[in-house]
Amino acid sequence: MSNGYEDHMAEDCRGDIGRTNLIVNYLPQNMTQDELRSLFSSIGEVESAKLIRDKVAGHSLGYGFVNYVTAKDAERAINTLNGLRLQSKTIKVSYARPSSEVIKDANLYISGLPRTMTQKDVEDMFSRFGRIINSRVLVDQTTGLSRGVAFIRFDKRSEAEEAITSFNGHKPPGSSEPITVKFAANPNQNKNVALLSQLYHSPARRFGGPVHHQAQRFRFSPMGVDHMSGLSGVNVPGNASSGWCIFIYNLGQDADEGILWQMFGPFGAVTNVKVIRDFNTNKCKGFGFVTMTNYEEAAMAIASLNGYRLGDKILQVSFKTNKSHK
């Protein structure tokens, strides 16, 4: 998870200016920065609006900052828009506050939660330790059910530390297994990112050439390679029983399964790769799929490869949604 919150939570937030700077939490994942600005401009003149995105993957982290010209408009925005329902989210609007060391690195990763626990249940469980800035429960993209994994960002690192001390190894109600509570890892510090940077961002590394790896770095099943070329449409769930399905868009016409294997293999166990081809030409139609067995490995692959330049193409990499791509 990116530390964008700490980096941006207090731009120009000193003295009276602090009463004009707002933090907006629980934004819909697909909301753009322009839409954020437009929404808050309905209250008064907005000096700046910033949607916070993951520094590696580029996707929205679900919160942003709006700085008004006047404190009066900022107050009106809180009174008017706090609690507003947007799509499936209820946004939270409040004053931002100055950044300091005590609020950095306060983001937790929780796994092993009962699948019946909702986002509200998780917040209720952890709220005793302090103010929760935002939270997210990961869900199966097909069923909408919890995957038993959540992220919680506290107001202060000390609050997060207390939560770890109290709940790591704890069995919550309805669970027969203890949960894991730890600080969320920053993808920028992950060794896989460094590996891929060395592997693909070197001047000599471009699409089409062989890549030499140690064999043990790949846990790939050749039986999983799907050479079907006649699909006009596919509908692969983001998480099927076989693993997590990743969608790769903007591949070149000459892309094949081998390049997907080479790109995703360093991140973990790949069980299936598929390039979607034109029925007549057998050329890649511009997209493909990779299935990985482990969520964290799949998420790291996405965080590292989304926006990666392959030849003259900039790839878009994300978890597969339910929508069919034709």
Swiss-Prot record:
Record's keyword terms, sorted: Acetylation, Cytoplasm, Isopeptide bond, Methylation, Nucleus, Phosphoprotein, Repeat, RNA-binding, Ubl conjugation
Main localization category: cytoplasm
Annotated InterPro entries: ELAD_HU_SF, Hud_Sxl_RNA, HuR_RRM2, Nucleotide-bd_a/b_plait_sf, RBD_domain_sf, RRM_dom
Modified residues (N-acetylserine): 2
Phenotype when changing residue 318 to A: Decreases phosphorylation by PRKCD. Nearly abolishes phosphorylation by PRKCD and translocation from the nucleus into the cytoplasm
Domain writeup: The first RRM (RNA recognition motif) domain is essential for binding to AU-rich elements.
Name of this chain's protein: ELAV-like protein 1
